[in-house]
C-alpha cells in the first residue's frame, strides 16, 4: 500500500500515479487531495481507476456519538420530515441533544476538539493552509494575490450571511468584479464559505447569499458579532449541503431544498408572531421536540 498526503504538491502527480498503477497492478494507492481540485475533470488519465471520497467535517450526530458513547444512526431527509417525532423518541431517553448542541456549533465540526490543544489556533492554521496551499497552489495563483483572497474572505465573514456587493468588494481588494466572483468560487470550493442562489441559478451569476461554510468558522474570525439566527441558518445549510441542493427562498430565514421543500429556520422561544403554514417546514432551535411540520433544528444534524 502506498499512502500519499497532499498529492497535488508533486508536479505531474496524476501521470505518475497512472504509471504506478500500470506498472504495479498489485499496488494499492491511497492519496489525499483537496476539495478545490477537480479530480476527474482535470486529470483524465485517472478516469476509471480512481474512486474518490469526500471527507467532511463531523456531523452533529457523529459529534454526539463521540461525546456520549452512543451509536445513533443517520437518517435521510425524507425520514426526518416524515418520522421525526418517532426518531426523537428513540434519542431523548439516551441523551439530551441540546446539552451538546452549542459545543458542536462552537467547535464540533473539525476533529481538533479531540486534541488537547488550542482549538481556535488550530482552526486558524487550517484556514490559512486552505488559502495558501489549496487555493494558490491548485489554482496556480501568484503569491502576491494571497492578501486579496484573505481580505475578501474576512470581508465576507464580517458582513454575515447576505448578498455580497461585488462592486464594493472589488474596490476593497482592488481587483475586478470578475476576479472577485472567481475568488468567491475558490473560497466555496475550499469549503470556507457556502454560496446560495435562487432556484435554477448557479455560478457565475451573483449569489443571493454568502455564508460561512460551517458555524465553527464564525467563532474563529475576530472581531465578529455572532448572531444566533445566523449561526443556526449556517448549521442548517451546512447539514443539508452534503447530499442536497439548498437555495434561497424569497424571504429572509427561508430556504428551499432540492427545488421543492420550503424551510424556515426560527427560534422556538420567539414564535408568538409566526403564522405557521402547512406548506413550510419549520426548523426550530432552542427546543428538543417537534410536532407535525415543526422539527427541532438539531435533528438535521443526523443527515450523515
Where are these regions (language model features)?
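Accessory nucleic acid-recognition modules appended to NTPase machines
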Residues: 110-250
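Catalytic cores of nucleic-acid endonucleases
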Residues: 246-251, 266-304
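Conserved P-loop NTPase "ATPase switch" module shared by AAA+ and STAND
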Residues: 1-13
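A short acidic, amphipathic alpha-helical/loop segment
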Residues: 15-19, 273-276
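Structural recognition of the conserved hydrophobic beta-strand(s) that form the central parallel beta-sheet
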Residues: 3-4, 28-34, 54
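Conserved catalytic cores of phosphodiester-cleaving nucleases, focusing on short active-site segments
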Residues: 236, 240, 253-269
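Interdomain motor-coupling "hinge/lid" segment immediately C-terminal to the ATP-binding subdomain
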Residues: 34, 40-147
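Loop/turn-to-beta-strand initiation segments
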Residues: 1, 24-30, 260
Amino acid at each position: 500500500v502506498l499512502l500519499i498526503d497532499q498529492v497535488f504538491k508533486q508536479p505531474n502527480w496524476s501521470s505518475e500515479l497512472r504509471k504506478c498503477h500500470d506498472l504495479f497492478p498489485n499496488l494499492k494507492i491511497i492519496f489525499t487531495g483537496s476539495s478545490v481540485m477537480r479530480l476527474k475533470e482535470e486529470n483524465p488519465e485517472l478516469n476509471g481507476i480512481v474512486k474518490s471520497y469526500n471527507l467532511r467535517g463531523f456531523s452533529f450526530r457523529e459529534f454526539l456519538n463521540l461525546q456520549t458513547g452512543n451509536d445513533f444512526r443517520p437518517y435521510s431527509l425524507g425520514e426526518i420530515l416524515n418520522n421525526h417525532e418517532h426518531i426523537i423518541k428513540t434519542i431523548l431517553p439516551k441523551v439530551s441533544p441540546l446539552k451538546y448542541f452549542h459545543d458542536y456549533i462552537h467547535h464540533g465540526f473539525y476533529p481538533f476538539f479531540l486534541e488537547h490543544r488550542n482549538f481556535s489556533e488550530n482552526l486558524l492554521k487550517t484556514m490559512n493552509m486552505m488559502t495558501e496551499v489549496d487555493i494558490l497552489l491548485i489554482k496556480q495563483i501568484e503569491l502576491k494575490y494571497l492578501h486579496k483572497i484573505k481580505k475578501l474572505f474576512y470581508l465576507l465573514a464580517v458582513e454575515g450571511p447576505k448578498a455580497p456587493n461585488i462592486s464594493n468588494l472589488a474596490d476593497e481588494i482592488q481587483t475586478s468584479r470578475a476576479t472577485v466572483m472567481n475568488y468567491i468560487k475558490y473560497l466555496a470550493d475550499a469549503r470556507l464559505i457556502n454560496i446560495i442562489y435562487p432556484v435554477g441559478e448557479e455560478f457565475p451569476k451573483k449569489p443571493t447569499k454568502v455564508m460561512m461554510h460551517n458555524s465553527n468558522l464564525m467563532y474563529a474570525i475576530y472581531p465578529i458579532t455572532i448572531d444566533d439566527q445566523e449561526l443556526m441558518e449556517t448549521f442548517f445549510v451546512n447539514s443539508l449541503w452534503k447530499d442536497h441542493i439548498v437555495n434561497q427562498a424569497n424571504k429572509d430565514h427561508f430556504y428551499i431544498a432540492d427545488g421543492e421543500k420550503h424551510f424556515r429556520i426560527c427560534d422556538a422561544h420567539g414564535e408568538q408572531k409566526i403564522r405557521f403554514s402547512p406548506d413550510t417546514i419549520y426548523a426550530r432551535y432552542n427546543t428538543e421536540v417537534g410536532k407535525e411540520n415543526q422539527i427541532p433544528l438539531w435533528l438535521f444534524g443526523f443527515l450523515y
